[in-house]
Amino acid sequence: MKYWYIGAAALVFAVAARVLLCRKKTSPNPEIDGGVRHFHDANAPKEINATEITDFRYKFSTVDLMREDSPIAGHLFTLYACQKEGCFELRDRSKEEGKKTFAPDETFFGKLQQIVSQYAFAQHNGQHYRVSGLPPHFGMELEIRYASGEEIRASNNQSCFLPLEAMEALVALFEQKQ
């Protein structure tokens, strides 16, 4: 019993080795609830010279707004338009209220570009902000492609960065097509 501490040290070493070797491997960037990832593309242009939109996608939520604040409050929207087809989807938090498709006419994309220019959507180009653990119906995603190859891409799953007036103008434009 003179050298009991050697046996105890060996036992502790064996247990520690087992714990270290058998633990789960984690990714280098685990997504912890509340963790924030902010990506800014410094090369994304803040001014777009093109005016011919070929593809427009915008998903956004107004569930955080009071119904008294705006007629579009309390809903989830998906607005999509390309040269051949368009789609307007309106959902409440829990159910789909309506999805309508349409064929955009020649004036539709001109009006859409006016809204994009008026509210300077390009200033948000390249901004991507994500908070892990939030429900999927928060925030917004914006993607606009032009015939010239230029693009506007931005997202934020915590809040909408476009002004309420811009969202209302887009909804009104897409609702006209129904």
What residue spans do the PLM features occupy?
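Feature marks short, highly hydrophobic, charge-poor N-terminal signal-anchor/signal peptide-like helices
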Residues: M1-G7
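Juxtamembrane cytosolic interface motif at the C-terminal end of transmembrane helices
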Residues: Y3, A17-K24
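Core hydrophobic alpha-helical transmembrane segments of single-pass membrane proteins
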Residues: G7-A17
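Short, well-ordered, aromatic-rich surface patches in folded extracellular/luminal domains
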Residues: C22-S70, K100-T107, K111-V116, A120-Q178
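Broad, structure-driven detector of short, well-ordered beta-strand segments within folded domains
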Residues: M66-C82
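Residues that act as N-cap/strand-start positions at coil-to-secondary-structure junctions
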Residues: A73-H75, E96, P136
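Short, solvent-exposed coil/turn segments at beta-strand boundaries
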Residues: L79-C87, S148
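Acidic/histidine-rich, surface-exposed loop or edge segments in extracytoplasmic proteins
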Residues: G86-K99
